[in-house]
From Swiss-Prot:
A Pfam family annotated for this UniProt entry: tRNA-synt_2e
GO biological process, one term: glycyl-tRNA aminoacylation
Reactions listed under catalytic activity: tRNA(Gly) + glycine + ATP = glycyl-tRNA(Gly) + AMP + diphosphate
Keyword annotations of the record: Aminoacyl-tRNA synthetase, ATP-binding, Cytoplasm, Ligase, Nucleotide-binding, Protein biosynthesis
Single GO term (MF): transferase activity
Protein name: Glycine--tRNA ligase alpha subunit
InterPro entries: aa-tRNA-synth_II/BPL/LPL, Gly-tRNA-synth_heterodimer, Gly-tRNA_ligase_asu
Source domain of life: Bacteria
Gene: glyQ
Lineage, top ranks: Bacteria, Bacillati, Bacillota, Bacilli, Bacillales
HAMAP family per record: Gly_tRNA_synth_alpha
Quaternary assembly: Tetramer of two alpha and two beta subunits.
PANTHER family, sorted: GLYCINE--TRNA LIGASE, CHLOROPLASTIC_MITOCHONDRIAL 2 (PTHR30075:SF2), GLYCYL-TRNA SYNTHETASE (PTHR30075)
Subcellular localization: Cytoplasm
Amino acid sequence: MNLQTMIRTLQDYWSEQGCIMLQSYDVEKGAGTMSPYTFLKAIGPEPWKAGYVEPSRRPADGRYGENPNRLFQHHQFQVVMKPSPDNIQELYLGSLEKLGINPLEHDIRFVEDNWENPSLGCAGLGWEVWLDGMEITQFTYFQQVGGLECFPVTSEITYGVERLASYIQDKENVFDLEWTEGISYRDIFFQAEFENSTYAFETSNTDMLLTLFDTYEREATRQMQDGLVFPAYDYVLKCSHTFNLLDARGVVSVTERAQYIGRIRNLARRIAKTFYESREKLGFPLVKEEGGKRHE
């Protein structure tokens, strides 16, 4: 099964479970969780079921295309369901079966790995899912997003697209993966991986990046003053990516690192609170009569 077919199979399966299928969000981010389709939609009582592929940029993980499984940019297939179904783990195992992986014939383990994203004020109960000794998925029940307690709980399933495809195709090197017939992962992504790694570690203008972080922070704050959550959140994502670029260049000290993360977290918390309040003023329109409760 090539990678393109694998993604389509997951999309079809989760669509059958009631999830809407979205396209990736067009601002740089380090993980699918940071998309507003997860971060903002996990806030408040309104139900939400969605799936999407999210390119995720992690500058410090770039290896110029020389490492078989560490990348500047990888892909995640993200599934979020709120409220979390009681049978969410069974649904997940069903998705593996659709990919030709019979849980009865493989060693599938849920290894406790509670999750935290300090820069966005997020935390939850979590498990890594290991398939025959390889981590392929992160499974999380959100307890807190943007500093707000989550009720109802959102379940998040994050498939590592390249890792899962490597297992299915029995490839040791991600660049040898077949994306579709006649086209490899290398054909599509190798040059970008090499050039982005060069940029992240060698050629980025750190003075400019420092200025950009401050500029993005000010603009996020300014938009928040007008109650504009989504424009403000875009700039928080830009702050996060800019910080990651600075971190990759090694120009951020340990003390400064904590300060930068704190600045991003403060913005994210303000946005989460404002988003909740804005939906509350609208009467949480997606909540049905039997819907969820509000934050206490």
